[in-house]
């Protein structure tokens, strides 16, 4: 279990406005409490020490919540460091693949 757990009730925090970050509401963002409480019940207890952030969208190395708070994604090293979130070239390739009649077959190359 994590040694620290963030509040699931929105608390007032200092406002932030920089090129890469914007915190303009209480944290967690109002309206995300129910999701965070459900996550506490289903996710590993070791995850409960993470910042209480429910992603709404992401671009480049930034993620956004439903209230427009803008965060730097320091977790992207696992998946997206090389290309970033919503990379236009990757999105184009994914869309082209989804338009094919066959996306994958277990036994044969596709």
Regions found by a protein language model. Give the residues of each.
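Flavin-binding catalytic cores
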Residues: 32-38
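Short, basic/aromatic recognition patches
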Residues: 40-56
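Glycine-rich loop-to-alpha-helix module at the N-terminal edge of alpha/beta enzyme cores
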Residues: 6, 10-24, 29, 43, ...
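Intrinsically disordered, low-complexity segments enriched in small/polar residues
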Residues: 29-32, 47, 58
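Active-site and channel-lining beta-strand-loop segments
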Residues: 52-74
């Amino acid at each position: 279990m994590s040694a620290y757990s963030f509040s699931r009730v929105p608390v007032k925090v200092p406002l932030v406005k920089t090129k890469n970050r914007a915190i303009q509401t209480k944290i967690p963002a109002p309206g995300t409490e129910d999701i965070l409480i459900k996550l506490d019940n289903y996710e590993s207890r070791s995850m409960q020490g993470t910042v209480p952030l429910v992603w709404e969208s992401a671009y480049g190395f930034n993620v956004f919540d439903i209230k427009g708070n803008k965060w730097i994604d320091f977790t992207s090293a696992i998946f997206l460091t090389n290309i970033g979130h919503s990379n236009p070239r990757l999105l184009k390739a994914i869309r082209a693949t989804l338009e094919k009649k066959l996306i994958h077959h277990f036994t044969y190359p596709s």
